[in-house]
From Swiss-Prot:
A zinc finger (unnamed) spans 3-34. Belongs to the NrdR family. Keywords: ATP-binding, DNA-binding, Metal-binding, Nucleotide-binding, Repressor, Transcription, Transcription regulation, Zinc, Zinc-finger. Its cofactor is Zn(2+). It comes from the Bacteria. InterPro entries: ATP-cone_dom, NrdR-like_N, RNR_NrdR-like. Pfam families: ATP-cone, Zn_ribbon_NrdR. This is Transcriptional repressor NrdR. GO terms for biological process: negative regulation of DNA-templated transcription. It comes from Pasteurella multocida (strain Pm70). Residues 49-139 form the ATP-cone domain. HAMAP family: NrdR (MF_00440). GO terms for molecular function: ATP binding; DNA binding; zinc ion binding. Binds 1 zinc ion.
Length: 149
């Protein structure tokens, strides 16, 4: 690896540790030329499948779009940012673990609803009302009854 200070290729790893719950390796490196130390992070390159939308079009998975949708449902709800990030990471993990190159948008929506149901029931109903296209109050009532069971 090139030294970020002097650009020489002569660097060595002096310490390695697992971080991010074992999904990343943190390495301390030292340059053999200028003796500066620097840190690198190594992660496995895992491909997130493309999303097949309801109209049949395909688009790359968009983590920001996922985050915005979840945050919008959780607006003014008592859920920590850390819990939101854990939910997003779990959804991405589930998508990767399908082993598929493409997944239907319905799967993404279902995973979001599962996570919101765990985080906050009100946010779940908010998201479900849009995602499932509730037309009237009866659909809200039915979904709320399902939560009570």
């Amino acid at each position: 690896m090139h030294c970020p200070f002097c650009s020489t290729e002569e660097t060595k790893v002096i310490d390695s540790r697992l971080v991010s719950e074992g999904y990343q390796v943190r390495r301390r490196r030292e340059c053999g030329n200028c003796h500066e130390r620097f840190t690198t992070f190594e992660t496995a390159e895992l491909i997130i499948p493309k999303v097949i939308k309801n109209d049949g079009t395909r688009e790359p998975f968009n983590e920001e779009k996922l985050r915005r949708g979840i945050q919008h449902a959780l607006e003014k709800r008592p859920v920590s940012e850390n819990d939101v990030e854990k939910a997003i990471s779990y959804i991405i993990h589930r998508l990767r673990s399908t082993g598929e190159r493409e997944v239907p948008s319905k799967l993404v929506g279902t995973l979001v609803m599962e996570e919101l149901k765990k985080l906050d029931k009100v946010a779940y109903i908010r998201f479900a009302s849009v995602y499932l296209s509730f037309d009237d109050i009866n659909q809200f009532s039915k979904e709320i009854e399902k939560l009570r069971d």
